């Protein structure tokens, strides 16, 4: 009999916790890069890396 009271109490606590939880919103902290790509192949990735390295070495 006490086990059913325990499970009922846990269920009530669980429901109250969900009901009184604060709402959370996720916000982007940075703007996306203009050349960002969703899917990229390896050749394009290597070319992008090579361009970044050579541009930094020229400075």
From Swiss-Prot:
It comes from the Eukaryota. The keyword Ribonucleoprotein does not apply. InterPro entries: Pilosulin. Keywords: Antimicrobial, Secreted, Signal. Residues 1-21 form the signal peptide. One of its GO terms (cellular component) is extracellular region. Expressed by the venom gland. May have antimicrobial properties, like most ant linear peptides. Belongs to the formicidae venom precursor-01 superfamily. This is U-myrmeciitoxin(01)-Mg5b.
